């Protein structure tokens, strides 16, 4: 039986691992604390938490739509209904647009796909070598592993750094600009506004989602996920760790200003920076 190592537990990594594990030995490694990649869910208490990565799924291709429909039937996913306020003047609102989310969190797809696969979290890949027909993998936690096959599903800039010695295809020499995102998660006193999300028309704050509206939990507080615009985050992401407090304050103040919700005491505030959040011009190449 051939051994496979999949780096990354996002939708891509989880799907590949799920297909391979039917006839092969498969292990997954991820530097994060849990599965999901850019569909991560930040749990704070029992069922309460924040979708602090991808906010929802809206499948466009026929293949992906069929995949999502199966998960909807299995109740792994559900439709996020409610009042979605559309304030952006550049993007046109699509009335047929459906927002699909995880039943318990947006990492539910990954959790479902890898439920029978051995996963190793807190494991960041640092170096790779190909020795005697085996991939030697050195991780930052001082572990070394060997596998017959290696599959990498992380962002292109990280992939390029690790694999440029091994991949001869011209695509590896290309330059690709990925956008950043700074996400702030807040817990406040309950407001009387029954809103699911805001899509803002602002240079700093792009989006706000009310986690309570996803009907995963009940409590006496409001949980909001705030996401910056890419333009603003691109300028600040390199020093977000040092400036978390200031960046969070800017986004929180913008939220109250733009939403019209009365400013109240912040009971919890978390900040997460996505250096490689998304890419507006992806390669046509889907895999290599």
Question: Positions of the model-derived regions?
Answer:
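Short beta-strand to alpha-helix junction loop
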Residues: 56-62, 81, 85, 89-114, ...
């Amino acid at each position: 039986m051939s051994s496979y190592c999949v780096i990354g537990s996002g939708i891509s990594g989880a799907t590949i691992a799920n297909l391979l594990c039917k006839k092969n030995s498969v292990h997954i490694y991820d530097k994060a604390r849990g599965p999901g990649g850019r569909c991560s869910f930040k749990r704070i208490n029992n069922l309460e938490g924040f979708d602090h990565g991808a906010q929802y799924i809206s499948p466009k291709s026929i293949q992906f739509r069929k995949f999502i429909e199966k998960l909807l039937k299995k109740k792994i996913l559900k439709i996020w209904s409610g009042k979605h306020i559309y304030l952006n003047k550049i993007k046109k609102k699509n009335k047929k647009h459906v927002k699909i989310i995880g039943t318990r969190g947006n990492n539910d797809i990954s959790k479902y796909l890898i439920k029978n696969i051995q996963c190793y979290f807190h494991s960041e890949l640092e170096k790779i070598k190909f020795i005697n027909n085996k991939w030697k993998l050195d991780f930052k936690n001082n572990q070394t592993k060997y596998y017959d096959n290696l599959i990498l599903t992380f962002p292109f800039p990280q992939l390029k750094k690790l694999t440029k010695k091994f991949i001869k295809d011209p695509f590896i020499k290309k330059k690709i600009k990925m956008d950043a995102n700074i996400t702030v998660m807040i817990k406040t006193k309950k407001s009387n506004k029954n809103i699911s999300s805001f899509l803002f028309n602002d240079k700093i704050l792009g989006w706000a989602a009310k986690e309570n509206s996803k009907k995963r939990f009940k409590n006496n507080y409001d949980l909001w996920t705030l996401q910056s615009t890419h333009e603003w985050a691109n300028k600040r992401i390199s020093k977000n760790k040092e400036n978390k407090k200031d960046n969070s304050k800017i986004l929180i103040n913008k939220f109250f200003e733009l939403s019209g919700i009365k400013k109240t005491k912040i009971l919890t505030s978390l900040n997460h920076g996505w250096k490689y959040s998304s890419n507006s011009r992806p390669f046509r190449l889907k895999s290599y």
